[in-house]
Regions:
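Internal nucleotide-binding/catalytic subdomain
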Residues: 150-292
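Active-site "cap" helix and flanking loop/linker of ATP-utilizing ligase/carboxylase catalytic domains
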Residues: 244-266, 283-354, 362-367
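Internal helix-turn-beta structural module
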Residues: 356-380
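A conserved helix-loop-beta module that forms one wall/lid of the active-site cleft
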Residues: 88-150
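Short acidic-hydrophobic, aromatic-tinged amphipathic segments that line or gate anion-handling sites
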Residues: 41-48, 119-123, 154
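Solvent-exposed alpha-helices and their adjacent loops that cap or buttress functional pockets
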Residues: 18-21, 34-36, 58, 88, ...
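ATP-binding N-terminal substructure of ATP-dependent carboxylate-amine bond-forming enzymes
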Residues: 1-93
Length: 380
């Protein structure tokens, strides 16, 4: 098995896959100091598609599980499938559900999926005109991939103008901000529901809540996620079934109608409003840090599940089995994140975990026998 990526999500995936009785050798490309404890790290970048293909062929790898969104959006699954290699993760046409927020809105609108009202702009002047008549607060989103940081909630017109100029003029998110969505601000509790699908069968995982702002009390800039917990009280069975029927199934059906067979995980970022669940965003991969709190409670064989998704046989599996426990995860980040941060600090205490505690590595690397920081989010 090959896991593509280097974050805490990939450490959690490699850790869980390694528990499967059907797992042979597990490789992680490029991996981190944590994945090295449960798998073999290989220094191949997530964007080096030919390097990954060679790795798969050299080691006779039977399944590739892709962690991050960038390689999926750039067609890694397409590349591997074209060479006959099974992959867990959608083709680029399906990954557009995350890589183009405007396309995701189009898909939702076509099926009347509940979501915030939004307008799309590729002209700064038109966007600036719009914000002067819009209700506050409003949400400005970069259309493309921005590592979870391309969403800004603006409480004043000045802040909205500054955000638009930063995204569209100064290109703070590169080409991701060439087009922006300006969306109504929805109030309610946010919930993530990750759903496995092989294009025919869909199976929800445990719901989770993640916390995006970097500071205590939900303050400061948005990040990829600073912590998460499973089984939020409001996301009961009725809530999950409503999300599946009103949101997940219609979106997958609309994509299928456009010729896109979606195989992998569809992450629905939801908000529980007074009118019911609405979509904030979709992602084409496992949430980080959500999957770090979900996988420790999964009692079924993750490798068997991923193989079934990749082969279109998810409907043949027995129902997923879960521990009745709950789990909480906290992200430890480098000072300065999500802006510029320092790296190279020695990490201590990794072996001093409380009973039942786990640590998944993200931005870490080995220097001799020491583990040092090498990224913004360091540990979960």
């Amino acid at each position: 098995v090959l896991v593509v990526g280097s974050g805490a999500r990939e450490h959690a995936l490699a850790w869980k896959l390694s528990q499967s009785p059907r797992a042979g050798e597990i490789f992680v490309a490029p991996g981190n100091a944590g994945t090295a404890t449960v798998a073999t790290n290989v220094p191949v970048a997530v964007g080096d598609f030919d390097g990954l293909l060679k790795l798969i062929e050299d080691h006779d790898i039977g399944l590739t599980v892709v962690g991050p969104e960038d390689p999926l959006a750039n067609g890694l699954a397409d590349h591997l499938l074209a060479h006959g290699h099974p992959v867990f993760g959608p083709v680029a046409a399906g990954a557009r559900i995350e890589s183009s927020k405007s396309w995701a809105k189009e898909i939702m609108t076509a099926r009347n999926v509940p979501t915030g009202a939004a307008a799309t702009f590729d002209s700064l002047d038109a966007a600036l005109d719009f914000i002067y008549d819009a209700d506050l607060p409003l949400v400005i989103k970069a259309d493309g991939l921005a590592a979870g940081k391309g969403v800004v909630i603006c409480t004043s017109r000045e802040e909205a103008e500054e955000t638009l100029r930063s995204m569209m003029d100064a290109r703070s998110f590169g080409s991701a901000g060439e087009t922006v969505l300006i969306e109504e601000f929805l109030t309610g509790m946010e919930v993530s529901l990750l759903v496995l699908t092989d294009g025919t069968t869909t199976i929800p995982l445990l719901p989770a809540c993640d916390y995006k702002p970097v500071g205590d009390g939900d303050t400061g800039l948005n990040t990829g996620g600073m912590g998460a917990y499973t089984r939020p009280a409001l996301a009961d069975e009725a809530f999950i079934q409503r999300v599946m029927s009103e949101i997940v199934h219609p979106v997958l059906a609309e994509m299928a109608g456009r010729g896109v067979t979606y195989r992998g995980v569809l992450y629905a970022g939801l908000i529980a409003t007074s009118d019911g669940p609405k979509v904030i965003e979709f992602n084409c991969r496992f949430g980080d840090p959500e999957i770090q709190v979900i996988l420790p409670l999964l009692e079924s064989d993750l490798l068997e599940i991923c193989q079934a998704v990749a082969s279109g046989t998810l409907g043949d599996l027995p129902p997923l089995q879960w521990s009745p426990k709950e789990s909480v995860g906290v992200v430890v980040a480098s000072g300065g994140y999500p802006g510029s941060y320092r790296s190279g600090d020695v990490i201590e205490g990794l072996d001093d975990l409380p009973e039942g505690g786990l640590v998944f590595h993200a931005g870490t690397r080995l220097e001799g026998d020491r583990t040092v920081t090498a990224g913004g989010r360091v540990l979960t």
